[in-house]
């Protein structure tokens, strides 16, 4: 539902979601886009709540839902990852799949470069990968071995001031050079899961 910022009154309600929602929604153009634990990514009109499209990508098991990832958008595409270890580019206007790749075994994390030319994701073992947001086929630009081991925490990659930041389930925070993937530094703060970092 959408709630008026100043009055607290409900502006619209959408009742078509069949699973629970944990993601941060993406606001892009006239759309609000989010996934839920029902195999579905939803796009609604941000002003009215009208359903514009739904994407399932053929997912049939609830545990493969694109629900934990925070969707990002660039060049007319929405980019997501999911527990089926795939990265997907979806047409922002229609909800049709442009491409879907299992090449890097990514899972439930994604980040967008500040110039919107690249998306980042975390693999399930050691590495960060970077793909181009341009074109209609998946194009990996680099892969960087950060050395964090087995990983499945849904913490997103964040770029700021020419540095890409990330974190892990094992308490590691790291920084990479966005164009090459070169590891700039990494620091283990503890042994617990770290959520998405917020560089300031």
Specify the residue positions occupied by each region the protein language model found.
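Short loop/turn segments that connect beta-strands within beta-propeller blades
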Residues: 4-8, 45-48, 91-95, 132-136, ...
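Sequence-structural signature of mature extracellular/luminal beta-sheet repeat domains
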Residues: 7, 86, 94, 118, ...
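Extracytoplasmic beta-rich repeat domains
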Residues: 9-29, 53-74, 83, 96-115, ...
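Hydrophobic beta-strand positions that form the internal "hydrophobic ladder"
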Residues: 32, 78, 119, 163-164
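Structural signature of WD-repeat beta-propellers
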Residues: 36-37, 82-83, 123-124, 168-169
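Surface-exposed, flexible loop/turn segments at secondary-structure boundaries
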Residues: 40, 60, 86, 127, ...
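Short, loop-centered acidic/histidine patches that primarily coordinate divalent metals
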Residues: 169, 176-178, 188
């Amino acid at each position: 539902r959408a709630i008026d910022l100043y009055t607290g009154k409900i502006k619209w309600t959408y009742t078509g979601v069949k699973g629970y929602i944990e993601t941060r929604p993406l606001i892009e153009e006239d759309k609000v886009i989010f996934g839920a634990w029902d195999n579905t990514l939803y796009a609604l009109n941000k002003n009215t709540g009208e359903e514009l499209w739904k994407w399932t990508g053929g997912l049939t098991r609830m545990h493969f839902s694109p629900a934990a990832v925070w969707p990002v958008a660039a060049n007319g595409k929405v980019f997501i990852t999911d527990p089926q270890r795939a990265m997907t580019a979806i047409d922002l206007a229609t909800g049709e799949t442009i491409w879907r790749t299992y090449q890097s075994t990514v899972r439930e994390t994604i980040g967008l470069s500040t110039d919107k030319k690249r998306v980042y994701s975390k693999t399930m073992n050691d590495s960060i990968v970077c793909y181009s947001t341009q074109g209609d086929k998946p194009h990996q630009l680099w892969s960087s071995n950060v050395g964090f081991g087995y990983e499945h925490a849904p913490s997103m990659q964040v770029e700021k001031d020419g540095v890409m930041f990330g974190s892990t389930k094992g308490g590691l925070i790291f920084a990479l050079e966005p164009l090459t993937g070169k590891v700039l530094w990494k620091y283990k703060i503890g042994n617990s899961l770290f959520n998405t970092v917020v560089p300031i």
